[in-house]
Amino acid sequence: MNKNKNIGIILAGGVGSRMGLGYPKQFSKIAGKTALEHTLAIFQEHKEIDEIIIVSERTSYRRIEDIVSKLDFSKVNRIIFGGKERSDSTLSAITALQDEPENTKLIIHDAVRPLLATEIISECIAKLDKYNAVDVAIPAVDTIVHVNNDTQEIIKIPKRAEYYQGQTPQAFKLGTLKKAYDIYTQGGIEGTCDCSIVLKTLPEERVGIVSGSETNIKLTRPVDLFIADKLFQSRSHFSLRNITSIDRLYDMKDQVLVVIGGSYGIGAHIIDIAKKFGIKTYSLSRSNGVDVGDVKSIEKAFAEIYAKEHKIDHIVNTAAVLNHKTLVSMSYEEILTSINVNYTGMINAVITAYPYLKQTHGSFLGFTSSSYTRGRPFYAIYSSAKAAVVNLTQAISEEWLPDNIKINCVNPERTKTPMRTKAFGIEPEGTLLDAKTVAFASLVVLASRETGNIIDVVLKDEEYITNILADLYK
């Protein structure tokens, strides 16, 4: 017997008048992709989502169709027209699903909430085993004020602890939502969202609550784009296990991976772990005559690998140098070396990588440091170069988007590497990430659909990754 489907419904019918962009806000760019692309990727990657329906505003239909086709969102099985109001768009989706079983689970989400965590989708799906309607909400933080809009006076201030702020997704059994809309369309009822329509038309139904997230913001005002971009810059809210299925690493078998700086530290561990998945690996470093600061050196090395393999699928640049000194105490040679390795080298690698990754629709991965958010004393060149790497990653992600090349940057917490030990000496056990953890996380990012993102790897990821590595090295 076939299980009932879990269908994601993405509401992308808004015109974004409050945003003032001159185009629908679902097409606003954040971290190298449109808000809609980010949202679709979340549902596409979710194991429990079987199909996706996009509800589109009529003038946006072709653009959405192009996005779905170009980025291979294979779970999208139809794009339908919405209406003037949100309820019109939901009704359009219900009508399109009239032949589906009543127990089909619908997960309805705003296209302009691109920072949704996948565990919220999972919790909504699970909660529908107990309820026929589920909302996502977070506790209200600010005081709620009931106002008379005519007089602009306060009527009352309710008890804040009893109030939550609604988000999406909202989830329903198809039969329940269909029944609610049958009553709603007869007129006489106002509803601001699908859950409110269920509550007003079917008062006997209990609506369950799933805890939302403060980062699951809706793009409504210009400032929201700024906030969303900052959240994408620092993906601390975004668990690595949400980026991709580990199974996708096995799909990388026989792909060609080049690691610049692969002779020791994180780079060496990337090489070692990649081999466990059957990935063909090449390490480039000074020890085999490759200088990341010399573009000719990189060009020669890439050409030799291509001549042998006839393709390059992934390139990782881990090369770095850290001088733990004040700027004025560094020699000019040390300053130039630091810039050449930490920033110019990244540029050299990106430029040289482009034609190879364009051919394979491959991916590039760089490394930054937590120091990119604020310059650090005693390693001013290093921290400023890492800030430059972040900006370069975000800029190149947009330049490379038409060629379907992914570029991301891993931002590990303090990690136990030979470079760090040389700069800072021996540090207390348990305060540093293991280089293997960062290496595995890097491969997970390479295997994902992500682009233009700065992805944190933190100590709390270590247990999750250590367990996977233990199985891998049995």
UniProtKB/Swiss-Prot annotation:
Pathway: Capsule biogenesis; capsule polysaccharide biosynthesis. It holds the Pfam family IspD. It comes from Haemophilus influenzae. Its EC number is 2.7.7.40, 1.1.1.405. Signal peptide: none annotated. It comes from the Bacteria. It catalyses: D-ribitol 5-phosphate + CTP + H(+) = CDP-L-ribitol + diphosphate; D-ribitol 5-phosphate + NADP(+) = D-ribulose 5-phosphate + NADPH + H(+). This is Bifunctional ribulose 5-phosphate reductase/CDP-ribitol pyrophosphorylase Bcs1. Residues 250-474 are annotated as: Ribulose-5-phosphate reductase. GO terms for molecular function: 2-C-methyl-D-erythritol 4-phosphate cytidylyltransferase activity; D-ribitol-5-phosphate cytidylyltransferase activity; ribitol-5-phosphate 2-dehydrogenase [(NAD(P)+] activity. Gene3D superfamilies: NAD(P)-binding Rossmann-like Domain, Spore Coat Polysaccharide Biosynthesis Protein SpsA, Chain A. In the N-terminal section; belongs to the IspD/TarI cytidylyltransferase family. In the C-terminal section; belongs to the short-chain dehydrogenases/reductases (SDR) family. The gene is bcs1. Catalyzes the NADPH-dependent reduction of D-ribulose 5-phosphate to D-ribitol 5-phosphate and the further reaction of D-ribitol 5-phosphate with CTP to form CDP-ribitol. Residues 1-238 are annotated as: Ribitol-5-phosphate cytidylyltransferase. GO terms for biological process: capsule polysaccharide biosynthetic process; isopentenyl diphosphate biosynthetic process, methylerythritol 4-phosphate pathway. Monomer. Keywords: Capsule biogenesis/degradation, NADP, Nucleotidyltransferase, Oxidoreductase, Transferase.
